[in-house]
Amino acid sequence: MRLDGKVALITGSTRGIGRTMAEMFAAEGAKVVLSGRSVDKGEKNVERIRGAGGEAMFLPIDVTSEDSVRDGVAAAIDAYGPITTLINNAAPTALVNVSFKPLHELTLQEWDDIVRGSVTSAFLMTKYTVPHMLQAGGGSIVNISSGAAVFGVPGLGPYSAGKGGMNSLTRVIAADYGRQGVRCNTIIVGRVVSYAADRGPDTTKEFLRVGNPKDIGYAALWLAADESEWITGSEITADGGARYNASEI
C-alpha cells in the first residue's frame, strides 16, 4: 500500500473532505490521527475506519490554540510515533457563524477569527509538527486552500485573505525545510459537495462538474506518498476547470 509506515495527522476530519481523506489514507496503510471540533463525529469516523481494517485515533485539537496544538501533536506522537504527513484542512469555526458580508460590515473580531482559523492554524500545526519530521528524516505537509484565495469572492474577504496567506505559507515552509527532507504543497479546492461549500453562493462555473471529497483525497494521497517526493512548494488546483472559466464567475 502507498502509505505503509506513514503517520498522518489530518485536521478538520470530522466531516466532508477531511473525513474522506482520513478514510482514504487509512485504506492505503497509514496510521491516521483525526482531529476536529466534534468528538462524537470524530469517534464515529474512527470506528468506521477501524471497522474497515484501518488504524486510527481521534484527538479534539483546537487548531487556533497553541496549547491545544502542542498537546495534541504530542499525544499523536506518543500513540503512533513521528508524524510523517500533516494535512492542514481545518476550516475556521467563525466561517460557519458569519454571514457573507462586505468588508465594511465585518467586525475586527470576525476578521481575526476567520484569518486565525485559516492561516494561523496552519502555522501552529506546522510549528509543532515539523521538528519531529526533521528528526525522522522528512515528511510531507499539505495545505488545503480554496479558490477563494485566487478569486475575489463577494462576502468572503477574511477567508480569501487567510487562504491566500496559507498559499504563501506553503512556499515559505518549502523553502525553510526542503533541504532537510520536509515537503509542503497546496491543494486549491474549488466547489466541492460538502457542508462548507453548500453554504456559499453559487459563484463558479466548472468545465467538468462540481467536485466531491474523493477528488481532493486523491490529490492529497499523491502528495503524501513517496511518488511525489520531487514536488514541493507547488499548488495543485482541483476545481473542475473553474479557474479557466473566470469570465463566468
Which sequence ranges carry the predicted segments?
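Residue(s) in the substrate-gating loop at a strand-loop-helix junction
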Residues: 146
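Alpha-helical segment proximal to the catalytic Tyr-Lys
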Residues: 131, 175-176, 229
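Active-site helix of classical SDR
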Residues: 126, 162, 170
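Conserved glycine-rich cofactor-binding loop
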Residues: 7, 14-15, 38
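Short C-terminal tail/terminal secondary-structure segment
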Residues: 151, 232-249
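The beta1-alpha1 cofactor-binding region of Rossmann-like NAD(H)/NADP(H)-dependent oxidoreductases
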Residues: 39, 61-72, 108, 214-215
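Catalytic Tyr-X3-Lys loop
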Residues: 84, 104-123, 138, 142, ...
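C-terminal helical subdomain
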Residues: 179, 186-187, 201-231, 236-240
